[in-house]
Structures are given as structure tokens and as C-alpha cells.
Amino acid sequence: MKKYDVQKFELLSNEQIADGIFDMRVKNDELAPLAKCGQFAHVYVPSKTLRRPISVCDSENGVLRLVYQVKGEGTKIMSEMKKGESVDILAPLGNGFKIEKGKRYCLIGGGIGVPPMLYTAKQCENPLVITGFRNKDLIILQDDFKKAGAELVLTTDDGSAGIHGFVTDVLKEKISEVDEVCACGPTPMLKAIADVCKEAGKPCQISLEERMACGMGACLVCAVKAVSYTHLRAHETCADL
């Protein structure tokens, strides 16, 4: 069985759910069921050379849910795609999170790093989910997390909703309640989370947000520097991390 492939997906819906954030649902009975939590889909955008990497928010009954933010011309074109269109997608890509039975996980998402935490939460038992946004206009997926049975904590940078502060403020208070942490979001946030986990002696898995080209580890466009055992080397975000 193939781990990934390029195929056409039927666009079922593409709706705006927050300021500049869209919820796209595409159907392909062969590839959608292969997606694991923390993986991503590489979406071809007409008139653009490079695909757009979008994290898998959910996968159920042959339908991939892709929640994305409009940041440039490519995602702007994506937001204008209509129901019934055929979407060219390379999926599923990336390693994803490794979830073990018997562990309680803390899942942390910042901004557009929140969507992949929903599918991850559905694979966990009673997860603690901490979501962070700049303000109330960018808040997404709160009801979805509650339906998934998560203990949910909302934070905003400006205090316009939920707790006024950062996700790390909540993590410091609750890290003793969990066995492991999984996180996705801006790099400074991930660094801060990793530092908290290191101090508490808790394992931590992170999913980086980087610009990508091939999505399979060949072109090195998304390479970042990270420590491997005892030395620093380049890792491909799409394939290694």
C-alpha cells in the first residue's frame, strides 16, 4: 500500500470560519484514510508553481479537513475555490505525532498551529488541549475540541477571550498533570514550550511551520538547524520533524 500519492480530491466545502481563516473539506476514499495526526497535505494551486502545505485538521469517512489561513496569493486562490471543483493534492506527507496508549497528552496549538491538534486530540485519551490566539477574532475549533472530549484551555495575547497570556503560562501550571506534550505553532512558541518541558523532565514532540517546496525531503527548502544527539545539523521539516 502506498504511503502517499498525488490524486484528485472532490471539494465538498470551503468556508470562512474566522478572520482570514478557511475550513476546506475534500473527499478521496483512497488517500484520506491514510492520514495520521500531525501530517499535512500538499495542495496544488492553479497558476502557482509550488504547492501549499496545509496541516490535516481531521480525517473521517474519506474526507480530509484542511483549515488554513490566507497569507498570500496562493492561499487567496485556495479560498476562492468552489464546491464541486477538483483539487490536486499530494498526501499524506510528514511523520506526524506518535501517540501511545495509556499516556495523557497535553496538545498545544498556537494560531494556525491549532488545526492539527484536533485530529491528534481524537487519537488521545482525555487530552489537555491549550490553544493560543492573538485575539478573539482569530479563535477557531473550540467546539470541535469539546466534542472530542478534551479538557480545553483558551488563551489570547490581548486578553479579549479566555486567559490573558501565553500557552506556556498554562503549561507551567498543568504540566504535572500530563505525561507528554505535542505542539504546533510559531517557532518562538515552540522553543518556549520545549524549555518548559525540559525543565519539567517531560518528553515533547513539536511540529514546525516552514515554507516548503517538494514536501518530501528532497529540495531542502524547509531545512532548519536542530540538535541531533550531540551535534547541530540541518533537518528537513517535511520529512524529519
Locate the predicted segments by residue.
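Ferredoxin-reductase
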Residues: K2-E85
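Short glycine/proline-enriched turns and hinge-like loops at secondary-structure junctions
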Residues: I21, A35-C37, I99-K101, M216-G217
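FNR/FR-type flavoprotein reductase catalytic core
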Residues: E73-R211
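Local cysteine-cluster metal-coordination motifs and their immediate loop/turn environment
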Residues: E210-R233
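Single conserved hydrophobic/aromatic residue that forms the stacking wall/gate
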Residues: H231-A234, C238-L241
